[in-house]
């Protein structure tokens, strides 16, 4: 009998200093059943540093969005949905999860989360297998004509660059929307993003034959709207 395979979905929300403020991991199997999860605000980071924001932005990452996000976290702490945890406590949880499940680690833009965790002292070195869920999405979902048509139909485009290029969005919000045929706005809180957006993407991808052979880096040239638009 084959040994049961588990996955660990990692998601983080960060501070202005490139460390982790909001940390989550979800342990699941191939069918998407959740066996364990960790969702905490990181002591010494969430409560001592400003959340990441962009003063030029006018969306969730701008000043107005920053105030809403801060209020949201305070409410989560007040109602018990989140608690503060030290980096040492997080590392103990991770080690216990690896010991029990030996899961493959994944995240939507894994390199980003690995870097922020390293900056914070969160130790992810115990995972034997890792892959980027964004890259898996690019090769298994986003490169398809159906996905690009869905993005066109829903105007899921990134902002035009100074060189006049506009690309399709390939973020978890749109990819999950494609899978469910219903786009829901990501809250950009770690647990909810991992559980409600990245988990459905993961289970969709790993049902595909040879999905691991189609893990490819994002290449913006392949997602230019002008190359896929038919007037």
Task: Identify the role of each PLM range.
Residues 111-133:
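Substrate-recognition/cap helix-loop segment adjacent to the acidic, metal-dependent catalytic center
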Residues 2-118:
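Conserved non-catalytic scaffold segment of RNase H-like nuclease domains
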Residues 17, 138, 199:
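Conserved protein kinase catalytic core
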Residues 76-77, 122-125, 182-186:
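Short, polar/flexible loop-turn hinges at active-site or ligand-entry regions and domain interfaces
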Residues 104-110, 116, 156-231:
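Acidic, Mg2+-coordinating catalytic module of metal-dependent nucleases/exonucleases
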Residues 46-71, 138-194:
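Active-site-proximal helix-loop-helix substrate-binding element of RNase H-like nuclease domains
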Residues 40-43, 128-142:
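A short, structured active-site edge motif that brings together acidic residues
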